[in-house]
Swiss-Prot record:
The keyword Membrane applies. Residues 202-211, 252-270 have a biased composition (Acidic residues). This is Attachment protein G3P. Interacts with G6P; this interaction is required for proper integration of G3P and G6P into the virion. Interacts with G8P. Interacts with the tip of the host pilus. Interacts (via N-terminus) with host TolA.
Amino acid sequence: MSPSLFLGWGDDYFVVLWIHGRAVRLGRRQGVGRVIRVSLAMLILLALTFSPIVHATCVQTEPSTSANNGSWACSDQGEAFAKASSMGVPADLSVCRMKSIRAVSSGPGVFSQRMTYPGDTCGIGYDLDIGTGNATYPDTATCAKRPSQSGWTNPTAPTPSDVCNDGCYYTYAVDAGGPKGYTYVPSGATCTTDDAAPPIDDGGDGDDDGGGDGGGDGGGDGGGDGGGDGGGDGGGDGGGDGGGDGGGDGDGGGDGDGDGDGDGDGEEGGEGAPMSELYKKSGKTVESVLSKFNTQVRGTPMVAGIGDFMKVPSGGSCPVFSLGASKWWDAMTINFHCGGDFLAFLRAAGWVILAIAAYAAIRIAVT
């Protein structure tokens, strides 16, 4: 197939043009239309590279067909991985039973969507691994270059957890100086929401706080008014009952005095401090108490020491290994240890080893 700006099945040549800028390989005589298409493609790439928007939408550079999902230009590595992972099965290929679908790195700045069909379908006779679309990004705009985030809310609070945001994996890190007591740091690995849940946007905090304050103020005012009314009614009843009983019985003056004095004392009780002065609301909620407790516990020297012991000194990024393509296999990115069940297993194993060591230390100390 001859080289073209918008390729379908063999898009590697076009990718080389975008990464290395080798426009001279487009052909000897491109024509006015081809030059215009090249200029538009370069403008799109520059806009994605230097745009101030952190999370821009991927731009389609080749239209989709019934057999291919086309090509897309994205702003960074995470968005390109997420785009390639989200591509559906083309209509012409859905008649074959798909064995797997995935996004793989097919070179610097490129993720390709790959599908594998078993050999007993569509008359192929053998397992077939094909590409059905790709997403490109500037090779310097990696997940590791994204900034840390201190305004996100942990989706599994109060239990700490890592998150996946726009195709990039972020790890949970204790930050006593942050507004929430923790910060999310990009690990450099790609991910999907199957590996970790997305973070919760911080905009929801304002609504929660407003609701709590309103309820507290209403309760305080009601208590004060009730106390005042009760005292006034008590005094009136006491005076009436005392006078009536004393005059009628004669000898029963003792009863009259007793009733009068009792109700009169009740009147003084009604003039006491209203409820709003005896009780002042703190404004605390269950979530804020748990969050503060979690932050203070994690800031203690013992827990901080355990966290440092379990942390690999690799600069805050998960090591990701890449294996170039050959005639026998496709290019591979080995990053499964950076998230998901395998990462959870590694962490659990570390805590088990630490617990065994602590138990052994106690045995040595007491024997």
